[in-house]
Amino acid sequence: VAFGTLTSISESKFQFGLLYAGSDDGKIHVSKDGGVSWQLISGNLPQNLWVSRVAASTHKKERVYATLNGYRNDIFESYAFVSEDFGVTWNSISLGLTNAVNIIVEDSANENVLYVGTDNGLFISLDKGATWQDFSNGMPKVAVHDLVIQTKAKELIVGTHGRSIYKIDISKVQELTNEVLAKNIHLFKVNDRIKSDRWGSQNYAWGKPSEPSQEIWFYSNADGVVNFTIT
């Protein structure tokens, strides 16, 4: 693919006309006037790569994320960066990622949570990119090319290369604040259940009786056995 093609564009929700654009020659530009003028902001990033994604933060006006990859030069290192000053300076948040990075998404409800799609699956960070964990959770280890958060349903939609589309409930992930993570164990709110007269009854003669169930979600900061009593 010849140089000169835009590969990613993102508009800040905090300011009309605050735009970021990435291209296939590794350059990232910012416009603060709706595209009338543009300023190069990728001078101190690795050069001659492909801007796989540029994403304005949904939590802070000055913050922007960028991911790069070097497919054309057989470079498969991970490149993920964040800027807290409109791209004037950048910090790498790639440590712990594997293979080329295709996309980065900031959680819409919790600014500490980031999702990254790589050529080797899905990753998550709970600390703004300081550390990363595999978040594939049973998904095949294939390239993840797109991620979208469905804010109303609190679901992460994952688009892969040749292995379909997946979704995962991230409602509890969004509740993993610093206060929750500091606890030894945390029990998330249990949804209310309304008793039904159909519980224990059969819908048809050869069917199984209806059996109610309840999911109980909790967070523990260490492996181990936990005993608890439900009253």
What residue spans do the PLM features occupy?
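Beta-strand-rich binding/interaction modules
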Residues: 214-218, 223-231
